[in-house]
Amino acid sequence: LLTLGFDAMDAAAMLNELYVLRGDGCFSTIDLLEVDLCTGEGALYKWGAAPSYLKKGGTVKKIGTASPPPGLGVGEEHRAERVGLSLQRGEQLVLTTDGIPEAACEQYLRACGPLSPRELAAGVVACASESEPDDRTAVIVQLDPASMQPHHTTRRARFRHTSRAACGM
């Protein structure tokens, strides 16, 4: 839907309606990031997904609230949450699946020093207990400072991070 030009909120609403109409109890979680690669301005759409974090040095800001995932109902309480973002130089946006415990992830992010996106993702995934049978994924978004310069043309990117959750719950 996004590649066809639909707005992110409209695409999420359509996805929700499809899941509800199927009526098989399946659902997924959604993290969708739209960001201008030159300015860092953008939005993060969250729906049923684990919290995300904005990290700069030892400062960590939790992003997102608990919301039911798409497919479990309709109405205002069953909508994607849109969070406006302005990614700055040196900031890292951390997206995770629910297989990574929130408390352990947040503690690690506050304690670790400056790391490359690859090192940070590996550390976040290591926060999860190996005994829990769940997916453990971390995506780190960090804009390259060299590309963050004012231009007359705008380059936008969309990152989709979806996780298919349980069916028949």
Locate each region found by the language model.
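Catalytic core of PPM/PP2C metal-dependent serine/threonine phosphatase domains
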Residues: 1-57, 64, 80
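Short, charged, surface-exposed loops that flank catalytic or proteolytic processing sites
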Residues: 4-11, 111-119
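Catalytic palm active-site di-aspartate
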Residues: 15, 135-136
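Acidic loop->beta-strand submotif enriched in PP2C/PPM serine/threonine phosphatases
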Residues: 25-30, 62-105, 129-133
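Conserved active-site loop/cleft motifs that coordinate metal ions or position small ligands
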Residues: 94-96, 137-142
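Short active-site-adjacent structural elements
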Residues: 102-106, 147-150
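A short, conserved beta-to-alpha structural element at the edge of catalytic cores
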Residues: 115-134
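Activation on terminal intrinsically disordered regulatory regions flanking enzyme cores
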Residues: 139-169
